[in-house]
UniProtKB/Swiss-Prot annotation:
Its main location: cytoplasm. It is found in: Cytoplasm. The gene is tsf. GO terms for molecular function: translation elongation factor activity. The keyword Cytoplasm applies. It comes from Wolbachia pipientis subsp. Culex pipiens (strain wPip). This is Elongation factor Ts. InterPro entries: EF-Ts_dimer_sf, Transl_elong_EFTs/EF1B, Transl_elong_EFTs/EF1B_dimer, Transl_elong_Ts_CS, UBA-like_sf. GO terms for cellular component: cytoplasm. Keywords: Cytoplasm, Elongation factor, Protein biosynthesis. Pfam families: EF_TS (PF00889). Residues 79-82 are annotated as: Involved in Mg(2+) ion dislocation from EF-Tu. HAMAP family: EF_Ts.
């Protein structure tokens, strides 16, 4: 049965697959486009399964913001070549929009969400693997919301607002403080803090750090009072490195982030950090 060009074109538009695959699927399904789509989805599953043991270490992070909530979505691929592909960029952007629209708070919720006429998001990922020829993986989602205030964010990159690292911040304020929030999010991206405040630090890790410093200071053979001041000073330096509120503001190192927040008449309630290499908070 000879297939007309309009059917082949429609099938290619709907699946993103090549001419020969679409033509063959239509021939096998007697020109029925719906059946051909299902057939190609089955082929896509098979192709994706063959790539499942590959390592997807590149990729992109996309952000989508609403007034009082926001999401960061990370999709991995194998190479920078695919990460810069327009179809991959569109896929990642669409997933962030869907996650925001559906208020997805977990990967499972997003994977099971509807994706255009492809089916679910997970099926769109599988289809993308088939079309782009690399393993694609929807690997992380960060969701942040606030009841009284705004969510602001920043993604560092140069690909249509997508990038390799992103942050969300929740601000409690009475007015529009998006620019303030964006500046804090940019700081989070640059400095990668491990906790919002000292109280939020992992206690076991904190105790271990103090023990190491105390052992280092003990070898100096200083009087007890002097040794305690040295330990406290080194701990303060440690807090500056890993605690957001204690860090020096990247735009003005004469003040801490806590000082910048106070001067801006806002309260920083929480933050999220997502990076391509897996580090996140």
């Amino acid at each position: 049965m000879k297939m007309d060009s309009s059917s082949i074109r429609e099938l290619r538009d709907r699946t993103g697959l090549g001419l020969s695959d679409c033509k063959k699927a239509l021939e096998e399904c007697d020109g029925d486009i719906k059946k051909a789509v299902d057939r190609l989805r089955t082929i896509g599953f098979a192709k994706a399964d063959k790539k499942s043991d590959r390592v997807a270490s590149d990729g992109l992070i996309a952000m989508c913001l609403a007034k009082n909530y926001g999401v960061l979505v990370k999709v991995n691929c194998e190479t920078d070549f695919v990460a810069r592909n327009e179809k991959f960029i569109a896929l990642v952007s669409n997933l962030a929009s869907i996650a925001c629209q559906e208020r997805c708070t977990s990967l499972d919720e997003l994977k099971n969400a509807k994706y255009e006429d492809v089916g679910t998001v997970q099926e769109a990922i599988i289809s993308g693997t088939s079309v782009l020829g690399e393993k694609l993986e929807l690997s992380n989602l960060c969701y942040l919301e606030t009841k009284d205030g705004i969510i602001a964010g920043y993604v560092h990159g140069d690909m249509h607002g997508l990038g390799k690292i992103g942050a969300l911040v929740a601000l409690q304020s009475s007015g529009d403080k998006q620019e303030i929030g964006k500046q804090i999010a940019m700081h989070v991206v640059a400095m990668k803090p491990e906790a919002l405040s000292i109280d939020d630090l992992d206690q076991e890790k904190l105790n271990n750090e103090r023990s190491i410093i105390e052992e280092q200071v003990k070898s100096l053979n200083k009087p007890e009072e002097v040794a305690k001041k040295i330990v406290d000073g080194r701990m303060a330096k440690y807090y500056e490195e890993v605690v957001l509120l204690e860090q020096k503001f990247i735009k003005d190192d004469k003040m801490k982030i806590a000082d910048f927040i106070e001067s801006s008449a806002v309260k920083l309630a929480n933050y999220k950090l997502l990076t391509l290499d897996g580090a996140n908070k």
